[in-house]
Amino acid sequence: MFGTATRTHATRVLLLGSGELGKEVAIECQRLGLEVIACDRYANAPAMQVAHRSYVIDMLDGQALEEIINKEQPAYVVPEIEAIATDKLVELEEQGLNVVPTAKATKLTMNREGIRRLAAEELALNTSPYQFADSFEDFKAAVEHVGIPCVVKPVMSSSGKGQSVIKTEEDVQTAWEYAQEGGRTGAGRVIVEGFIDFDYEITLLTVRAVDGVHFCAPIGHRQEDGDYRESWQPQAMSENAIKAAEYTAEKVVNALGGYGIFGVELFVKGDKVIFNEVSPRPHDTGMVTMISQEMSEFTLHVHAFTGMPINNIVQYGPSASAVILGQGTSTDIRFDNLSKAMAQPQTQVRLFGKPEIDGRRRLGVVLTRRKTIEDSIEDAVNSASKVQIIY
């Protein structure tokens, strides 16, 4: 049962994080007449622009989080980012709060150590070799154990922050220092991951709902500096690789529990898959589903966590997304040349409405659907390059 927004019996959804993914979740909630409250650490974040109300808070502050939850009495608390006081969510969930998909999932996936130990040690899934380190001495030992080349990441970071590749012994000190600067909560623990040989990487959007576990077609993507630049669906895979990917994803999402969409990141080598990470929420590479599927990842997420069946996920054919990346400084960003960017049929531009930029920031995305994946990617990239950003 849903109440009507702004009325006495309104069904309220509290978004923790109000970026471009949260904005699309908010819009899907609005389509169901749900009342949306958006939180973030800065004002006028994208989801705040389409919410009924908003709050600017430090979401790592458990007391501030609890005060808003007590005030708003949401039916659903929906984390959109990792940097949240997850211990407080666990505590409040034990008192009856509905955290999407679960507070456990939010806490485990906030920290690379939690989810890696779950996947490798509890679920016995294939992962890259890894070691954790708290000090520089432990870090050097971890690098030696895992071997060079290797990848270094803070256990708590996102969007590539603090991540680097150690290619020679000379990189060890620099990699440690960079990881200490890039963590979400400042200096701290890191993971050292061994290099693995893979053909490509995918995001397998996996929905856990009242009518079971459902899979979207696999999404391929290209990363640069730890952030995605293009994604496409479907990624060509062998039948055995798809079965292995779905097996891995289902084990992970069932271990995390709850209802919603999960972005399961996997490396693929031939018919073999290697688990990388999982986000218990819509995934940035999944923005392609806004043009490639009948129900986008955001629609699927909202339908799942509100208890609706998913039934069948319809995929429309070769589609792609390409990021509109800004580089500059402004508190009054403008966009031009959009008519040329959208000159071709089955091409869409989504601008996120981010209020400011200082450096490099993802400001929008181009979505295309063509006869082939190659044409979809090429046209998406070309269209994105035509968008003129005025700082």
Swiss-Prot record:
Function: Involved in the de novo purine biosynthesis. Catalyzes the transfer of formate to 5-phospho-ribosyl-glycinamide (GAR), producing 5-phospho-ribosyl-N-formylglycinamide (FGAR). Formate is provided by PurU via hydrolysis of 10-formyl-tetrahydrofolate.
Keyword annotations: ATP-binding, Ligase, Magnesium, Metal-binding, Nucleotide-binding, Purine biosynthesis
The organism's place on the tree of life at top rank: Bacteria
Binding positions (Mg(2+)): 265, 277
Reaction equation(s) it catalyzes: N(1)-(5-phospho-beta-D-ribosyl)glycinamide + formate + ATP = N(2)-formyl-N(1)-(5-phospho-beta-D-ribosyl)glycinamide + ADP + phosphate + H(+)
Molecular function GO labels: ATP binding; magnesium ion binding; phosphoribosylglycinamide formyltransferase 2 activity; phosphoribosylglycinamide formyltransferase activity
Gene: purT
EC number: 6.3.1.21
Biological-process GO terms, alphabetical: 'de novo' IMP biosynthetic process
Name of this chain's protein: Formate-dependent phosphoribosylglycinamide formyltransferase
Subunit structure of this chain's protein: Homodimer.
A GO cellular-component term linked to this record: cytosol
Listed InterPro entries: ATP-grasp, ATP-grasp_carboxylate-amine, ATP_grasp_subdomain_1, PreATP-grasp_dom_sf, PurT, PurT/PurK_preATP-grasp, PurT_C, Rudment_hybrid_motif
